[in-house]
Structures are given as C-alpha cells and as structure tokens.
C-alpha cells in the first residue's frame, strides 16, 4: 500500500503520455520478464496471486480522480497521460481525463493494429469519446429511440428515423473502436461486456434490414434491448445491476428448494384433484327429442351432449359453469342436474390439476398468492371441504416460507454488498490519512523554513507577502502542499481583503471578546471560548466545528456512520453516481442527509457579520443559541434570527449555510435545565463515539489549503450571487425596521405560535376531510370560507416569518421552502379557481398535512425513510423503470397484433378488453399489474390469443425478475433504512420541538395556578400548621405510589424543605421545575418537594458527560446524592422495560404460600373495616379460608380443569349456527351448558379473589381479561333470566361471548409468549398505523376531489346491462326512464366508492391489498362528471392516480409494518434476550458448537450378524452407495408419477401400471433385505418403519385400488410421501449445503411458527364465531354462496383462512354492505325465526378491516420476521467452521471404533480414528505428534473419553479461546445428564504425560546402557533383566505425581462428589423455577 499511497499527488502527477513513456513501459516489461523467469511447476501459483499488487480501486476507469490530486493543469484535459496507478507500470496503458475529472483508461497498443496512441485520428476519437456532450447525445438518442418504440402503429416516416438511430449507434461504436481498439488487448471495445450489448443490437439492426428473416416483429423486439444501453451510459446503474446479478446467484439454492417443494405439492395435487375441476352440473335426465335421432339411423352422441355448453348449469352473472363434486362435503347440483365430468377446465382450460405441468402452474400461483381464492373455491367445490388442509399446508409452507426466504436471501445479499462498501470506505480513509500526514510534514518543513527566514514574530500576512515578492523566500505553504489548484495569487489577495475587512468591522463594533487573528490561512476567525467554570481550558475554534461538517467526516451522522472522507466529490450535489456510496443506505452514506449536500460549508463573512449586528451579542454570532456548548449565554440570544422556525439550529439538521457551522442549538427550557456548571463540550460527544484518536489525527492533519479547497468546492454559486443576496435578500435598512423585526421575531418564533399553527393545520385537514357527495350549498359555503381563512393564516405566517428572518435566511430552512411552496400554490389556486380543469390544484393543499411532520417524529421518520429509500433507490427505481419499459415494449411488439386479431376469443362483444397489449399504455399497465403480483388472469388472456409458450415465458420473466427479485431488493432497502437507530433518533432526540415546549409551558402554567389556588385557599381558611403540611404529604403519598408503580422513576423524599410566605416551597421546590422535564407528562410538577431521578439512556444523551451534580447541588443546599441513573434501559426503543423493582424478586422462601393482602393500603386507611386481625376469631377463620382457596387455586389440577372448561365452552359456541333452531336437543343442552360454564367461571373468579386478594388480581392484565369475559356472561345470564334476551344490546353482548377463547391465551405458554411480544410492539404498530392513516388521508381526500359522485350509473336490473351514453347521458335521463314505469331500471352507485373520506379509506384498503381494486379502478377510469353516466375508458389517465397510490400508499406503508415488527422484535430480544448480548461473536460460535455436540451421544451401532450370508447382506445394505441407489429409484418413481395425466390412453395406463409394479418390487426387496440383515434392529430406526408402512400400503394398493379409491384417498398419494426420504440424501451431497441451511432455518423457526399458528387459529376461531352470529343470513352474491358463507362454523373458518392472506375479502364484504332495495328485510329463512337477508355495513367493515389488520398485517408479518431472523442465524451457523453434520459424522465414525458404545476408545486406536474422520475434524496421518500435543486425559486401561477427543479436535478447528472452559463445563453437565453412566472413571494420565514417560524411559535406558558399557559389563542377560526391573520401577514412581496432579485437569470424567453437588444445585434451581411459575400465574 505504501507505494500506492505515497505516489506524490498534485500537479507533478500529470505527465503527458509520449513515445518516451511508451518506451519506458516496454523497458519495464522487459526488465520484469528478466527478473522473474516463469516457474516450471504450478505449485505455488496461489500464494503468488495474493502477494501480487492489485489495481487501486480509486483509480479505476470510470471513477472520478481522487480529490487529493488537485485540479488538472491547463492543457492536460482530454490529453493522454501516463497512468497514475503503479499497478499499470508494467502494462501498456495510458489514461485520459475529461473536464469532470472522470478517468478513462486505454490500451497503448495500436488500435486495429494501425492506429498508435499518437495517431491524430485516434486522438480525435478519444477526445470525442470522453467528452460529456458525446454521452449526452447518445443518451438522448436512446431516449428518443425508446419513445419511437412505444408507437404501436408507427407512421411511414419513422422508417427513416430508424435508419438515423442505427447510424448514430454505428458512429458511436466506430468511435469507441477507433479510440480503444477492437478486442485483443485490455480496455479494448469488446473487453467491456456492456459493449457486447451494443454490438449485438447494431448487428441485429443490419441483419433485419438486409436479410429477410420472416417474422420481423419478433426480431424487432430485440431493438428494445437498446433501452438497456442506458445502463451502460449511466455509471451508477452498473453497480445496481451487479448487485441484482449477485442476488440472483445467491437465489439459486432457494430456487432449487422452491422448485422441489412445488414439485412435491404439485404431485400431491395431481394425485388428489386430477380431473376434478371438469366436474359440472349437466341437465339430467336427458330429454330424448328428435333432434338427437337422425331418421333413426344414428344413435345418441354422448360426447357432443356433455361438451355442449347449453347443457351446463350456469350461475347468473358468472362466465363459467358451476362446478360440483360427488363427495358429501363438495358442491351440490340443483334439481334436474347431475354432476359429471364434462367440457373443459375453468379459465379457458388453464386452471387444472390434470397434468403435472398444469398442477405446477397452479401451485406456483398458490405460492405467489395470485387470485388463489378462485383456485381454492373451485377445488373445494369440486373435491370437498376437507381438502382445505392441503391449501393450509401449501400457503403456510409454500407461500409464506418460500416467498419470504427469497426476501431473506435478497436482503442478505444487499447487506453483504453494503458491508463491502463500508469496508472500502474505511480503507480509503486510512489511505487518505497517510497522504495527509505526508502533506503535513511537507508543510511543517516549509513553515519552519519560513519562520527561519522571517526573523522572529512576523505575522502570517508578512510571510505571505514575502512569498509574493519572491525575494529569496520559500513558497507559501499552500503552494508547497501541492494542492494548489488555482493561482496562489488569487487566493492570497482574497485572503488579504477578507482579513482587512474583518479587522475593520471588528474595530467598529468594539467586540467585547478578543477576536483572534486567523491562525489558519483560511480566513476563518477562531475564537477562544473558555467555559464558565474553567473546567476545561481548551480553545474552541470554529475550525474544529467546521471540520464537523466536511461531507463524510465521522461526526456528520448521528449514528456511527463509517463514512469515507477520501473521494471529495467536488460541488455538492453532482457527485459521481458510480461512487462507493451507491449502495449505501442513509446511515452509511458518505454525506448523511441530502440536505447536507445543499449548503456551502463556510458562511459568507459579510452575511455573518451583518447577521450578528442586531443579535444583541454580536461577538457570539457564530453560535447563536448554542446553549449546549456555552451554557452561560445570555437569554437575549434567544432573539437571534439564526434560529429556524423550529427554534433549533443543529449541526446536521436541516442544512443552512449557517447551520452547518453552528453547534447544536437548544431551546430555552433546555438552557434552564442545564445549570451553569454543566459541562457540555462537543469534544466529549466526539469521544463518546469511540473515534477520538481518529478524529484528533484528522483534525491535526487537514491542512488549511485543503479547507480552502473545500470552501471553493462547496460554494456552488458565483460570487455575484452572494453580493445580490446581501443587497436584496437581507433587509437591514433602518434601526426602526430592525426593531420591528425583533418584535415580529419574538412573536413568530414563540412556541405557542407554532402550537397555534399546528392546530390550524389539523383543523384545515379536518375541513378538507369533510367534503363529501352530495353536499348542501350551505355546507359547501362553510368549507369555502374555511379554506380562505386557513389560506390567510398560512400566508400571514409566511410573510411574518419573511420579515423576521429575511428572505435569505428564511429559504435556508427546508420546512420554510415547503411552506412557501404550498402557500404560493394556495394563492394561485384562489386566482385560478374558476378556470376549468385546474381543480387538481386543490389537491396540493393536502400537502399541508405534511407540516405535521415537523412536530410528529414518527411521521417525520416515515417521510425520511421514504426519502432515504427513494434516494438510495434512485438507481434501483431507474432499473425497475427500464425493466418495466422493456417488458411493456416487448409485450406490445410480440402480442399486440394477436390481441387485435383474436379478440373474440377473450371478449364476447369482440371489443378489446381493459387489459390488453395493443398499445404501450395498456401494455405498461399489464406489466405494472404483474409487478403488483397479479399475473395469472392477464396471462390466461394472453395465452388464449397469442399461444401458451411465449406468454408463459414473458410473464414468468416479469414475475420472477420484477416481482420476486427487484421488489424484494426494494423491501430489503426499506428494511435497512428502518434500522433501530432511526427509530431511536426519532423517539427522543434530546431536542424538543416547539410543540413539546408549548405543551410543557401550559402544564407549568396549570401547575403554577394550582399552587396559587392552594396557597389562596390556605390563606383564607386558616388552619393549623399540621393541616397545612398534610395535603402535600398526601400528595406525596399518592404521587410516590403512582410513580413507583408505573413509571420507573425513583423518587427521593426531600424532608427539610421550608415554606415561604406564599405557600410555595423554597430550596428544591422552585428550582426543580426547571430541570425536570418528565416524559410522564410532568406528573410531579404539581408537587414541588420531590427530587426526581429520571433515567436517561446512556446511548442516547447527545453529550455523555452530562453532569447531574450541578442539578442536585443547585437544588439542594447540602448536595443531594442523586446521580443520573446509568442503568436506564430506554435505549431508543419503542418499548419500556418494567421498573427494576419487579426484576429483583424479594426472597420470602418460608412464606411464599401465603396469600397477598386483599385491599390496597389506601382502602385500608380509609375504611378501617377492611383491616381484620387474623390471629383470632372470625379473622382467623377468614385467613384459613383464604389459605385454603390459595392452595386450591395454586393446584395444578385446578388449572387443568379450568383450561378444559374454557375449551368446552369455546367449543359449545361453535354449534350455534343457523341450524341450531332445527336441532332442539342440542340447543337445550347448549343452553344448560352455557349456564354451567358461567357458574363455574364465576366460582373460579370468586376463588381467585379470595385467594389472591383484589390487589394482585386487578393488577394483572390477564386477570382483567378473565374478569371482563365473566362479567359479559353474567350480564347475559341475568338478562335471559329476566326475559330481556331479545333486546338489541343484550344480543350484541351475547356476540361478545366469542371472546371466551381469549382466556386460553394466558394458559398456553406458547401463545402467551407471542402475545406478550405483540403487546410490546403495539405502541409502535399503532404509531405506524396512525402515520399510514395520515398518509392515506391525503390520497383519500384526493380521491374524493377526483371521484366523488362520479361512480353512479344507470342500470337495468333484469337484463343486468348498463346503458350506453347515447341512450342515457346523466341522472335526469335515467330518472325519466324510471318514471316511464320501468321498475327494473335504477340509478345505482358502486358499493365501494369515493363519496366521502371514510368510503375513500375503504376503497384505498382494497387497492392496497389488491383485492377488489379492479372494480374501483374501472369505475374511476370510466367516470366523467358527478351524476353523469360513465363512459368506457373515457378518463383513462386516472389509472395513474392508482399507480402512484400503489407505489407510495401500498408499497411503502404496508411494508413499513414488516419493518416495525421486525425492528420491535429485535429490540425486545435485545432487552430480554440476556445471554445473546453479553457474548462475543467468538463465544457465540463456541457456544453453538458446544450446544450441538452436547445433546448427542455415541450410539451403539447395530452389531454385524454372525451368520455368514446375513453378514454379506448386512455389509451390502449398510453401504452409502446402496442408500444413494434407492434414492435414485425414488426419484425415478416420482418421474413416472409426473407422466400421469387425466386424459391418458388405456395403453399408457397399462405401461404406467407395470412400471409402478416394478418399483413396488424394488422397494419391497429393499425392505426384505434390510429386515433380513438388521433383524429386530430394523424397527429401531424411524425411517425404516416409515418405509415399511409405505411398502405395505403400496402392495395393498395394487390389489385393492378400486375399493380404497372409493372410500379413502387415492393410494398413489402414499408414493408421494416417499419423497420425504430425499431429505436423507441431502446429508450425503456436499453441494447441497445451501439447501440444508434453508431447511435448517425452517426447522429452527418451527417452534415459533407453531406458536404464531396457534395464535392465528385463536383469532380465526373468535372471528368465525363473531361472523356466525352477525352474518349468517346474508344474501348470497359476490363472494358469498352456498359453500362459502358464515352459516356454520366450518364454513366461517374456510372463509377466514382465505382472508388471512387478504384474498377475496372484497367479495365477502360486498353482500354485507347491502341495504334495501338491494336486499329484503322480510325474507323468510325456513327453519329459523330470523327475517331478512341484509347485512350490517358498519359491523361488516369493522369486522373485515380489523381481521385484515390483525391477521394479514401483524400475525403474518410476525411470521416473516421470524423467518428472516432464523435465516440469518442459520446462515451464520452454516458459515461456522463446524456444523451439525460434522458432529454427526464424528459420532458415526466413532460407532465403528467403539461398537459397544462405552464412550471410550483405546489409545492405540486414536491415530486411526483421527485419520478416519472427515474434514474439518480430521487429523490426517502422520498425526502422532499432534495428538500427543493435544494432551488428552486417559483413564485406566489407556482409554480416552469421546467428549475429550471431540473437545480437543473442536479446539483445533476453532482455535483456542479463554472462555472455552466455562462453555465446556456446561457441555459436560449436559452430557453427563443425557448419558448417565454407572461407573465414574477418574483420569490417571494424559497422552502428553504418557509420551513424556515413554521418552524419559528411553533416555534412562540409554543412559544406563552407556553407564554399563563404560563399566565394561557386556553380559546381555544380566543387563536386560536389570533394565526391565528398573524401567517398571521408575515408571511407577513417575506415575504417582501424575495422578496426584490430575483432578485439576478439567475433563468429562469427574469425581463422583462433584457430580452430586451439581445434581443438588440442579434440584434447587428447579424448585426456584417452579415457584416463579406459580407466582406468574394469575
């Protein structure tokens, strides 16, 4: 890196590329070749790869030249230069820079072998190529070409235009080829894949022109690919496309899994429903007329009869005949019809399960949930309601799981991309630092030299002047720095002028503070501020602050954004889109907020000075209101107009020229809060980010010239503009005027004015929301006047602010610009009110609603998230737009003609339907609809007119690319911009907005008034002094009680306060109000004698060292001991942790079985009778009774009994359907049961009251729920007894009994967990819901403006036909017809309309969920004017309104729910997760590895049989190859099943039968062989039992197929189940790791998903009972018919399951909205006393909307949250070095070495075992040394325990870690628990010690031998005898110390005593847990 970084940047780097340069390169190439002769062997190739230099990422072609290189010297733009990148020193390349400093790299070899780099033609080509105008022209050409492509019938002359385009593209390619060369060397034309695209497009153009290829239109569609050229022209798009391609690669595993799962489900569907969807009701018996007999010669044609449509039963108003089934729960036929297989399948024959391919399509449709309610209803009608189970499985496993896996994968890919970007940025920062250090050194040297020259203390000016004169003096530092990009003279002159001006102005004003002369040459004044209490003597310079706002400096964002400060991107907004920032979401983007880019970094001096002239504190003009840093500022600062309308000028906030340099400003209340001593220095804040070191070094390094440069680059406007601004936009003409300004400023900036304006906004919104149709003229008049008034108010506000702030500063603030825009529009609208067609301007008034965002953080956050996403998504949106465009054009070119020619196939009137591709707009709409997820219906039309293959391909591509990939990437970006930090930032930003301030002021006022009244009362009614104190005491009691219970705020009584004369309290009393701004709405302001400690989250306070001592010292003379509570938990979250009191259970071991007090202390004090003596008399009996009740209630059986009762009572509710009247017995039983249940529940409640006492009972939310439900039952019981059961109110109370099942919630742990999590999320869900409502309000009001009253139409009810415009034009025409005695004609409204805002909301909900939206859109598109008959597509561009709403209203807001829920769960996990947070990543990995290996134990392998033949079979069966062969057979069997179709011939059927027989024989053989080899052990393995059952069923199925099919399901289904065995094969395939991860994620999510499923079932249960009691008798129409209705419990559940995914809820709602005359109030229902079939619109809307919000938005999104969470965990685990499978294989191999499962292995086998393992645990031979080094403990008999080996091997893979021991201990406990072993083995030695013993024995032997040899004894026998004895002796001696020292070694084999201790501890722990569980129960 050193070489690369220290390449000297600056003007010297720019060297023109000359023939000498080329010669140098060639010389270097030759040298390098000589240096490194190529290696003969390829052995170390890889290492070389790593060590090779890599190209510098900042100097890549296409990127901007890094800032550090300065400006390009004159004359070197567009001239070939030598390459900057050292990497290319030995390659023939050169670079060229254009004016925008973009870098282009070319090959220095001759282009096309002719044109050298110095050739004139090539140089001209290069100049053209790199010029920005050239790319602009190409861009414009492409866009124009795109416009021409959208013509459906191009005019004649367009042919010539076509040639022009081709010519331009050819010219472009030629220029590129001449400039770059064609294809041989690097950087030539064809080396860039995007150029391949260009090349192919041009070739196609010429081929189609000169060669006749038949179908031209298909080839013309390839021209569309030209649109893709935009991607190659706009640099940022390439990155996004790269990311898309990455995510598609990552999706491969998910795709495989998806296809596999869908295939399995499709096979099941094929077997279950083959041919069912052709069942129709045919006229029966046949009417044998003459028509069927031709002169008696020909018989009856059965085929023709059943395929004749006229013989089918058609439901009125439906296009398809009615389906039916022959099972009891399927759809039935009416009288006179018989159910039989006839005709084709529904939907042109494309919806069926007749062949595998159609079944697969149906399943894909189910997975994407498009119009699946139709498939669901058809299938249940044809096959029976029981098959709902199939759909539940597919929707939950297929749809929710797989689709969200796609989302998870895309999100992960995005996250990885983001990480890479961040790392790159950090690396750049390091490089930048190194460069700056170098510059600094140069500069310091220069300055030292300068100092030496200029004797002593000459000012900087003098030095500069000397430099200017150039008399032997060194150059000024700015020149030395090599950054000097402009003539230094210019800059120096400017500096001088500025300095003089500053000095003169400073003198004039006589600044009280000393103005320091500029220490830096940037002309900025640095002021030294000393903090009041002199705790810090640091000079605070503006330079330090200005640094804070360098784009990308680490302090710019509030989060720890890792931004780069390397590639400074010249003038703010025009940054290079291809930069590393492309993918960054808002947090990590290089320049935090987009506003941040808009401002110049430094303030024009003059503006600053002027500004301060009336600020009253001119010296401090820079830091107006900066109380945070300078708390002792005078109050007068408040008037300074730098304050924006919010009263806040923040460093990073809404950017303003001034704001960028100011420290954060605060409000008056905060100034008061922070006492004079509080030390709030922003350096402290910087340190808190853990970046101090980096910051300091950068601060010291950024050179003055660099800052100067920045200043230049940040000023976007020419100097004349600033002059103009100073003269005309800053009004300071007269002292009186300034006085007036101050007064206006005081008024306008007051928080109360803000409050008033906010109230006006809310009122104005209300006024706009009150518009409806039809309105009375008076009401209309009121609204018009209201509008004028509000316009007036807002205009006045704007003008006053303009006066107060000056236009220049007014428009620096984003909100003000917004206000100004809206006010101008409103005024314009007033002027143009009467102009026709401009009523749309009224819609702009709606934008006022957004002004609420200023004071409503969540709305602000939502807008920010949308803003950030749109920002970060800018490129993605462009890519999406290009995709939509391309597909729309392709669709139009390919299918447009077909739609016109074959229109009669899809339309009865032979008119083009609404959805077609005949022109571009409609084609675009179809593609957009596919992106919304609705593809199947338009695809059927397409397939019918244009053939199946092409349509399937195009639609699937749009669906997969557009919907599944790009839209999920959108969602991933949304979720990422939703990170917790955003929420935290909005929750409490430390800053209070004016609204909060005004509310606090009002509260203070009220509190003050209370105190005054209190004092007044006391003065009048003179009482004793004791009484005087008492109310305060009581107040304290109450407050303390309430606060301690609920708010988690510690309160300390301050005992010695004194009263002063007016009854307020001195000392703490008066002052505490200043400091406490309590979230709990100031609950203690009224009580001035409390010191309150409010916890502030550490991570949240903007300045960490907030010294609270000051607060207490000021408030309390003795100095109270209150410090800030560090352990607070409100870390920016949306849920509050419970007060700590609850977390520490008070230990009461001996008396925890005693009941709690009955009443609260307050009650006992007031009513003495509540207090009884429990020692004697009645009190004692009462106490015994309570204890008995307590024992009963706490008993497990009691709880079980109650759960049983709850389930029974809930079940009883399910019987109360419409048939209950006819079933007298059941009805009577239910009535009695109801009473019994009520009595039991009342008894239970009384018992609990007695046992727990009222306090405990009524402080538990679950008990409240029980209480309310029991109360409802009791009321209805009493009402029945008194005979009031028919009263409406009592009836509706009875429906509330549906809530009974809710009681089950608290009883089932799983559901309770989910509900608790949900309850935690409710506040933020409600918040988002509210924001969504506000957001939708705008669209709703707009809808009312556009469509109110326009949805009515004239309609003939008998023929069900709408009148055309020429027959009936408007309402009056229709009424005339009605008067003409035509009873069947009506003027009717669409049920879902925009007549008022409420109705608009419902319509928008349908559009957002894409259900029923078509009818709403059609009505809008046909609308004309209020009360006019609609005209078909007369208002076609109204589609755009819906498109915009879908993007913003549906897309962003609905996905926001997912964001909020995921975010919330993560936060709750953080708070309550415990162990996860306190572990490092390493520990987690260890812990997971250990967790996995602890639960396993070595199993005894199945012993090999002794019989020889059995043994051979055993070996054969247990081989892996055998398993794989069987798997392949299973797959083949599946393939043969796929071949089956409904219409197959007899011959085919026979072939399939025999093939199947062969497979059955194979599987039977497998089964028999295994049973023979494995003997009785065969049945100890689950999979074998499964196989056995399947084989038996298959054999039985072969013989009894007919009988089984008649009574049960088709036997082939069992074969499908066999597919489950494929799961086993996955372990054997190494490549399937990704799929294993996905399945593992599913397994991990199952428990949580089961809990959510339970909760969902409970919700469905309650709603279906509610639906039965309210909508049972609704008229059958739309989505409600004889099968799908609310008449019985089963039917209700079927309907509600369908709505869980929001499918078809519009159809179910429509009949419920019926009112007479659409329904009858007197209709009789046989067998029931109920009359009428009308619905109840309000109840219906509430029912469906609440159900959709609960199920579709919340519960289903919880499902998504869990899948995303577990997927990331599973991915992490699969990335771990050790996975589950590795441990599995470890144990499998272990079994071979330890056949008896003793858990020990002999030392001698260890080396073989280690070698037999698989990677990564394997220790390959030779491994003796390594195994010895592991120091494994051994027990007697030289055996080693398996867990010790596993630990050692794991440690070897994962590396050592200090925390291993603790984890290890836990693992051992687990292992010992799961493998209770009778014998305890104590280790006596270890492998290392054993080796040491062996080695020492050998050494001793050698020594002794030598000793003997020296002594001369050579008699062998004696020697050997002695040696043997000595050896064993010594060995024994050696071993004693080893055993003694061993117990310290921590292994699994532990002494018994320790185990007993552990067991004892475990028992204690269990007892404690049981106690806690008892207490948690109600």
UniProtKB/Swiss-Prot annotation:
Expressed in the hippocampus (at protein level). Expressed in brain, cerebellum and spinal cord. Residues 356-380, 920-940, 1398-1419, 1689-1711 dip into the membrane without crossing it. Changing residue 1904 to A: Decreases interaction with CALM1 in the presence and absence of calcium and reduces rate of channel inactivation. GO terms for biological process: adult walking behavior; locomotory behavior; muscle organ development; nerve development; response to toxic substance; sensory perception of sound; sodium ion transport. Residues 1936-1947 have a biased composition (Polar residues). The gene is Scn8a. Changing residue 1902 to A: Decreases interaction with CALM1 in the presence and absence of calcium and reduces rate of channel inactivation. It is linked to Defects in Scn8a are the cause of motor endplate disease (med). Med is a recessive neuromuscular disorder that is characterized by lack of signal transmission at the neuromuscular junction, excess preterminal arborization and degeneration of cerebellar Purkinje cells. It produces early onset progressive paralysis of hind limbs, severe muscle atrophy and juvenile lethality. Defects in Scn8a are the cause of the jolting mutant (medjo), a mild form of motor endplate disease which is characterized by the absence of spontaneous, regular, simple discharges from Purkinje cells. After 3 weeks of age, jolting mice are unsteady and have wide-based gait and a rhythmical tremor of head and neck induced by attempted movement. It comes from Mus musculus. This is Sodium channel protein type 8 subunit alpha. It catalyses: Na(+)(in) = Na(+)(out). III repeats lie at residues 1178-1493. The lineage of its organism: Eukaryota, Metazoa, Chordata, Craniata, Vertebrata. May be ubiquitinated by NEDD4L; which would promote its endocytosis. One of its GO terms (molecular function) is voltage-gated sodium channel activity. Its main location: membrane. II repeats lie at residues 733-1005. Residues 28-61, 501-530, 586-597, 1949-1978 have a biased composition (Basic and acidic residues). Gene3D superfamilies: 1.10.287.70, EF-hand (1.10.238.10), iswi atpase (1.20.5.1190), Voltage-gated potassium channels. Chain C (1.20.120.350). IV repeats lie at residues 1502-1799. I repeats lie at residues 114-442. The chain crosses the membrane at residues 133-151, 159-179, 194-211, 218-234, 254-273, 388-408, 752-770, 782-801, 816-835, 838-855, 872-890, 954-974, 1198-1215, 1229-1247, 1262-1280, 1289-1307, 1325-1344, 1437-1458, 1522-1539, 1551-1569, 1582-1599, 1613-1629, 1649-1666, 1741-1763. Residues 152-158, 212-217, 274-355, 381-387, 771-781, 836-837, 891-919, 941-953, 1216-1228, 1281-1288, 1345-1397, 1420-1436, 1540-1550, 1600-1612, 1667-1688, 1712-1740 are extracellular. One of its GO terms (cellular component) is voltage-gated sodium channel complex. Pore-forming subunit of a voltage-gated sodium channel complex assuming opened or closed conformations in response to the voltage difference across membranes and through which sodium ions selectively pass along their electrochemical gradient. Contributes to neuronal excitability by regulating action potential threshold and propagation.
